[in-house]
Curated annotation (Swiss-Prot):
<comment type="similarity">
    <text>Belongs to the RxLR effector family.</text>
</comment>
<keyword id="KW-0964">Secreted</keyword>
<dbReference type="GO" id="GO:0005576">
    <property type="term" value="C:extracellular region"/>
</dbReference>
<feature type="region of interest" description="Disordered">
    <location>
        <begin position="42"/>
        <end position="78"/>
    </location>
</feature>
<feature type="short sequence motif" description="RxLR-dEER">
    <location>
        <begin position="42"/>
        <end position="56"/>
    </location>
</feature>
<protein>
    <recommendedName>
        <fullName>Secreted RxLR effector protein 10</fullName>
    </recommendedName>
</protein>
<keyword id="KW-0843">Virulence</keyword>
<feature type="signal peptide">
    <location>
        <begin position="1"/>
        <end position="22"/>
    </location>
</feature>
<comment type="function">
    <text>Effector that acts as a broad suppressor of cell death to interrupt plant immunity. Inhibits cell death induced by cell death-inducing proteins, including the PAMP elicitor INF1 from P.infestans.</text>
</comment>
<keyword id="KW-0732">Signal</keyword>
<keyword id="KW-1035">Host cytoplasm</keyword>
<dbReference type="GO" id="GO:0030430">
    <property type="term" value="C:host cell cytoplasm"/>
</dbReference>
<feature type="compositionally biased region" description="Basic and acidic residues">
    <location>
        <begin position="53"/>
        <end position="63"/>
    </location>
</feature>
<dbReference type="GO" id="GO:0042025">
    <property type="term" value="C:host cell nucleus"/>
</dbReference>
<keyword id="KW-1048">Host nucleus</keyword>
Amino acid sequence: MRVLNFVLTTTVVLLTSSEGIASSPQVRHIKPNVAIDHLSIRSLRATENPGSDESRLNEKDTGFDPDGSSSKEDEDIGEPTFWEKVRFRYWKTMGKTPGDLRKEYFEGMDEAVIKNNPNYKLVQQYEVYYDEKSSE
């Protein structure tokens, strides 16, 4: 009797859920008509100032600080996401320092390769988080 109830319940669920599936003519109407070309996407800055020359350095912001750090790199770090903040809190609780993360992620790598690594930004964000929480 239980097997029969299971089979009937499964059949009812499958039949009712099959009506929610889009048929092929419906799918054609849902698809966008515009093909996205990733190479043709322009940045907002270029579209706002079409006549500006982006290759020139702005005299006010050269991206270099006298103490040797780059302000451009600090600006590009951005805000960590919620999950990155959770990860940072876990690392801080476990006693990991930014030096430990650099060693874990980038040991034996060239500096040019490190800056192109997706984890480079994460480690920089953790350094900022670590400094803020250590000073409290």
